[in-house]
Every structure is written in structure tokens, then in C-alpha cells.
Amino acid sequence: MKYEWRKQEKNLYGVKQTPIIVEVPKQKYILVKGKGNPNEVDFSDRISALYSLAYAIKMLFKIAMKNKTDNEIADFTVYPLEGFWKKVNGEELDKNKLEYTLMIKQPDFITQEIFTKALENIKKKKPDALYDEMSFREIEEGKSIQILHVGSYDEEPKSFEQMNEFARKRDLTIIGDFHKEIYLSNINRTSEEKQKTILRYSVK
């Protein structure tokens, strides 16, 4: 049986273009931190390395489960790329100063041991210094506001304003100086105006 996040986790990923409140539980991620302009090569290199590790984890799990019954999960769909972005308050946006954490969620059944083994395998197969910066950890975002943004990343402020107004009307306060973005579209295959991104703030 194959675990498919689009079908199994509609409460988190089946988002509309209007703000909603969600409770985001503790979840497992592989992640790598970075700083600088997302249009630079370093950013795309981090994404490529992160995806390579994600697929190494998937393949290792499939091999381990190859003799299991049809009723057991033996495969899963790789989750979309996500990222925490540090907000820039009261300043003109300078992309060269952006700080971010790129991540790909992992199913609950992926363990630290599987991550460690997959990391060892990918280092041997595709040596890259970036793998030394990657980690496996659990993150709990808790009560959050999220919205589906359709369009270019430069137009995200319009969606953030909807979220801010939604929060104000409900006396909710945004926690921290960062927000989450979940990239549902393949930017290499999707035109800017059709790109789908989930935007999320933790609130209290």
C-alpha cells in the first residue's frame, strides 16, 4: 500500500484561497538552513540535495518493506518542498539578507535510523558537502493561520494581508519573526500565474 499525502492529509494541504485556522501537529522533517537570495545557485543546490536525500529515504524504505503484505504501507509519495522564511519588518525587502530553512516533511513511520542510513548512502553515491548540513527533526507549529496563494512569489504580500486581517478580527497574534511556505507546484513546469503556495503563520 502506498501512502499519499494529498489524499491522507487534506486538512493540511487541501487549502483554499481564503484564510483558515489549522492545528499543525508535531511532524518529522529533513532540513537544511541557508541565507541569501533565492535566485542564486546556492539556493537551488540546497533544494536539489534535499530532494536527493528525500528520494534516498523513500527508496531505502521501499527496499525494507518489499516483502510486506498489501495491507501494510510499503511506499509513499515524497512530500512537497517547504520553507521557513524570516520576516523583514519595517525594511525594504533585501533578498540577499533573507534567512531560510528548507525542509521536506517525512511520514510518521520514517525514523532517525532510516534517515541516518539514507544519508550515508547518498553521501557515497553523490558526494556533496551540503549533506553535512542536513538534519532530521520534529517540529510542532501548533495553532496556525494558512491560505493558498496562487500566483508569483512577489505577489504574496496580498495574501499575507488577508491573513493579517483574518488574525486581527479574531484577536490572534502572530508568533515569531518567520512564516512557512509550502510549494505545491513545480516551478519548472508551472507558469507564474498558476503557481500554488500554501502560506502559514503560527498564532496564539
Per-region residue spans from a language model:
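A solvent-exposed interaction/effector surface
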Residues: 1-204
